[in-house]
Amino acid sequence: MTQYTLKQASVLLQSKQISAVELASAYLAAIAEKNPALNGYITIDQDKTLAEARAADERIAQGNASALTGVPVAYKDIFCQTGWRSACASKMLDNFISPYTATVVQNLLDEGMVTLGRTNMDEFAMGSTNENSFYGAAKNPWNLEHVPGGSSGGSAAVVAARLAPAALGSDTGGSIRQPASHCGITGIKPTYGTVSRFGMVAYASSFDQTGPMAQTAEDCAILLNAMAGFDPKDSTSLEREKEDYTRDLNQPLKGLKIGLPKEYFGEGNSADVLTALQNTIDLLKAQGAELIEVSLPQTKLSIPAYYVLASAEASTNLSRYDGVRYGHRAAQFADLEEMYGKTRAEGFGSEVKRRIMIGTYVLSHGYYDAYYLKAQKLRRLVADDFQTAFARCDLILAPTAPTAAPKIGADASPVETYLSDIYTIAVNLAGLPALTLPAGFSGGGLPVGVQLVGNYFAEAKILGAAHQIQLNSDWHGKRPE
């Protein structure tokens, strides 16, 4: 019962072939069996889950259900929900029970979706491996010795392991797409401002965006329909007409212009990644898509620009954690200043401290122009590159990550880890939508994904192209033993 896609589960629930309680119970049993090794979930509450499932069954019986009523979903530990712990995988918020619910979570609750739990992540969404979690690293279900990616690694792992039909993630510099690639699932980061950020713990406010993660592009489109929309509680939310993100699912690939950035297909990519790209190129050609070489020359500048800007925003956003109103507080201190210092030293992990220090430095007097202002100018150049490319093509095909998932504990420096996000970060700098879908496997049997990037508000086109690729391939249907 836990092998269904979101769409399949929806059909079975609406036709009353299964009940929401039966489906939720099956997932809870699978979680109890597999999660101790996987560590994909860090918070489970069976009573709350089954109560939501019973309410969903009542709604279905009364005939006022939506297509998502009774379908289970997992939430990254970054989303607040009344009565649930929302720790952001940090000691700092280990005991924080949220008094309110994030808008995107409320949207799915209004549809009647059933909460399975909170998934593991890199602390405060800072990381690419899920090793920066206070609760220990999540594992890759394809090989438990490898990382699932990050920062939404737990969400990717539980969907791949069939411990949830879908999950929510957040994407600041690739945190939905990179773990989706490493775990062999589909995940989309929408255009910045499409999905409300209210109730999602902030890391870098001008980058953060919520998106769905599931087995298929069709599942992601169905979820995004429920997630997206204007929210007056979020000052960065975009006021646009409601869209149907499933509208292009049946559009053929014939005639679609796909850009291939010449800078993305060279050195630095493993043979496995190049093979996955070629698999996708061959499929696109066979279906009649037109392939065009484009250039994104400023991509190499995206890493330094991102880590200056995101760290600066993080240092500001995380200044609220001081042990006064909520979160961890040091047990012993002589005065207020010592309480602040000890609380933050004890509550934050090493990667979070590193980024706070970088951010504080680049915003400090005398360095603002040299670092922060220059990085903002680079951000503009990266965005301009994409607009030049989209003048010639509809979508861009790119790698998601230069390699398959590395081993847990791999001896990589912070800079080497940052460089692994080279293909995802540019998209966040520009605020564009992008989706990762499975496209092959490494020699070691680990999934490898590729990325489809679109212009602003091209989510339906991206999802349609991805769905057509998945109708003509079976990478997305593979699952770990």
From Swiss-Prot:
Which Gene3D superfamilies does UniProt cross-reference here? Answer: Amidase signature (AS) domain
Q: GO cellular-component terms in the record? A: glutamyl-tRNA(Gln) amidotransferase complex
Q: Which residues form the active site?
A: K76, S151, S175
**Which residues are connected by disulfide bridges in this protein?**
none
Instruction: Look up the domain of life of the source.
Output: Bacteria
Record SUPFAM superfamilies? Amidase signature (AS) enzymes
Quick check: keyword Protein biosynthesis in the entry? yes
* EC numbers, comma separated: 6.3.5.7
Keyword tags: ATP-binding, Ligase, Nucleotide-binding, Protein biosynthesis
Q: Known catalysed reaction(s)?
A: L-glutamyl-tRNA(Gln) + L-glutamine + ATP + H2O = L-glutaminyl-tRNA(Gln) + L-glutamate + ADP + phosphate + H(+)
- Gene Ontology terms for molecular function: ATP binding; glutaminyl-tRNA synthase (glutamine-hydrolyzing) activity
Q: Which Pfam families match?
A: Amidase
**Chain's role:** Allows the formation of correctly charged Gln-tRNA(Gln) through the transamidation of misacylated Glu-tRNA(Gln) in organisms which lack glutaminyl-tRNA synthetase. The reaction takes place in the presence of glutamine and ATP through an activated gamma-phospho-Glu-tRNA(Gln).
Protein family (similarity comment): Belongs to the amidase family. GatA subfamily.
The name under which this protein is listed is Glutamyl-tRNA(Gln) amidotransferase subunit A
Origin organism is Neisseria meningitidis serogroup B (strain ATCC BAA-335 / MC58)
